Amino acid sequence: MKYKETIAIVNDPDVTLGSLENNNIKSLNAWELKWEEMTNSYDYIILGGHMGAYDTDKHEYLLSENKWLSKSVDNGTKILGICLGSQLVADSLDGEAYLSDEIEFGFKNLNFVRNEEIFSDFQETEVFTWHRDTFKIPSKAKLIA
């Protein structure tokens, strides 16, 4: 299977690609982008941040990113949302990001609910979580883990 080049959208300067940085994935800062010039010729990873998708008063670029995400999904662009990124994808479609009543904190095993070949190397992966935001899954989205 041939994959397109992947671009990671960084939403917070403190939340980067980390160990994926050297895997031929280009990073772009969301707050510096001209969203109207973004193309659908890439696959995208939308990274997390300390804010919630609903914090648009403090982070106005999230509004432009949200509009771009909606158009990109409609155009068939492949998008992986991680943490805040998944909230933004949900908000751009018919889902909804919101503050949960519970805090999730600590190391957790990834729990895959779909068998996707692209994630086969991550089947036994432990990740660190620290968030209180969650979202309703949009009808166009696929829950993978």
Question: Across the structure, where does each feature detected by a protein language model lie?
Answer:
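Pocket-forming structural segment of enzyme catalytic cores
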Residues: 93-145
